[in-house]
Amino acid sequence: MLSIKWIRENQELFDEKLSKRFIEPMSSKIAMLDGEKRKITSLIQEFQHARKVKSKILGNMASKSGEEFEAIQRDVKHINEKLEELEQDLNNNNELNELLNMLPNIPDEEVPYGMDESMNKLVRTYGETNPNALNKQHFELGTKLNLMDFEQTAKISGARFVTLKGDLAKLERALINFMIDVHTKEFNFFEMSPPVLVRDNAMYNSGQLPKFAEESFATTNGYRLIPTAEVFLVNIVADTIIPREKLPMRYVAYTPCFRSEAGSSGRDTRGMIRLHQFGKVELVSITTPEESKHEHEYITNSSETILQKLNLPYRVMLLCTGDMGFAAKKTYDIEVWLPGQKQYREIASCSNCGDFQARRMKARYKEFGSNETTLVHTLNASGLPIGRTMVAILENYQNEDGSITIPDVLINYMGGLQKITTHGE
């Protein structure tokens, strides 16, 4: 959520920043609604003060009867009625909060202006792409190996699900352990194993609600399946004041993730690129405003290191204003090369959300010996999605006979297995 105080004091700049997100000017409407709310709040405070004064007079009166006593009693009753009316007006005046809840984060100055992904900026590349490489797609390879099942799975669970079998299931497990080891041992992230069900308020705090309600799976009793472990990990600091010396706080977690893929009809309908359920290792960092820019590079490097160790070609893109996520002020997308598609595809997003999530969840820190608190900055990164990493391995490590060579760093995690071959029935 954006700061109403900042909007109030920077209306022209606010509209300018919104325009970079391709949103019409909102400052006038927000200022009007804010003025109404502040007027009601001011009246409530005045009446509360008047009630306090008159109640004190009543308490100090020697005689608890008589015209003067009864007149003041009537005044207090009238004040209470008026307060009830004003507080009801304030509770009903939800338009301002509803409007603020739908506004995305303000882009950082370094973010390029642009409408869509075609305007994203190339930051760096890693590895060489070979236009003459074997180019079967992952679902062809996995199906031929008899280790990836879509058909029978669809009969049981529907479209956009997959069952991995045998050595591909083992590869999935190996990748999880490998990624967690790198992030914890080399980058000092603290491992967590969180629930996959959260309450709606946790989804609100992280920015998924209310704007993206249709993109998640909801239960009938106020819970939602997480679309990413970020939801739980950032909420660890909700409604807390953190000692400055404990920052940064870095968390890593592997979880299944669940997305309805609303609005993705017709996109990536084959294979493992876009599923309703997928596993992902997620990174979250909680830090200070002064350190968040450095932390953004740090958390991005942690994600990149996984691909480097797997020797997978990739590039890093700085997303433009029109392609960034709702809660982000600056985002790097890491795109891995897929020979089967002959293109780079997104495998990770690494975002600095500034104080946007922190304001929603009231997460603050303070210096030792100080009573003043400041909103933390939150950052997140995919570190990485297991399915898309498997896709990249299958396509980049495929052999003429359809077998898959195991990347060197995974051989020990695979119990010494060096190649995945066809599994017989």
Swiss-Prot record:
| One Gene Ontology CC term in the entry | cytoplasm
About its domains, the entry says: Consists of two distinct domains, a catalytic core and a N-terminal extension that is involved in tRNA binding.
Q: Which domain of life is it from?
A: Bacteria
What organism is the protein native to? Answer: Rickettsia akari (strain Hartford)
Q: Which cysteines are joined by disulfide bonds?
A: none
Pfam families linked to this entry? Seryl_tRNA_N (PF02403), tRNA-synt_2b (PF00587)
Substrates-to-products reaction catalysed = tRNA(Ser) + L-serine + ATP = L-seryl-tRNA(Ser) + AMP + diphosphate + H(+); tRNA(Sec) + L-serine + ATP = L-seryl-tRNA(Sec) + AMP + diphosphate + H(+)
Q: How does it assemble?
A: Homodimer. The tRNA molecule binds across the dimer.
Please give the PROSITE patterns that the UniProt record associates with this protein. AA_TRNA_LIGASE_II (PS50862)
Family per record: Belongs to the class-II aminoacyl-tRNA synthetase family. Type-1 seryl-tRNA synthetase subfamily.
Do you know which Gene3D superfamilies this protein is assigned to?
Bira Bifunctional Protein, Domain 2, Serine-tRNA synthetase, tRNA binding domain
Under which name does UniProt file this protein?
Serine--tRNA ligase
Query: Which GO biological process categories is it annotated with?
Result: selenocysteine biosynthetic process; seryl-tRNA aminoacylation
Top-level EC class as recorded in UniProt:
ligase
Question: Any keyword RNA-binding?
Answer: no
Q: Which gene encodes it?
A: serS
Residues recorded as binding L-serine, renumbered to this chain, are T228, A229, E230, E282, S382
GO MF term set:
ATP binding; serine-tRNA ligase activity
Q: Which UniProt keywords apply?
A: Aminoacyl-tRNA synthetase, ATP-binding, Cytoplasm, Ligase, Nucleotide-binding, Protein biosynthesis
The subcellular location is: Cytoplasm
Main subcellular location: cytoplasm
Can the keyword Nucleotidyltransferase be found in this entry's annotation?
no
In this chain, ATP is annotated as bound at R259, S260, E261, E346, I347, A348, S349
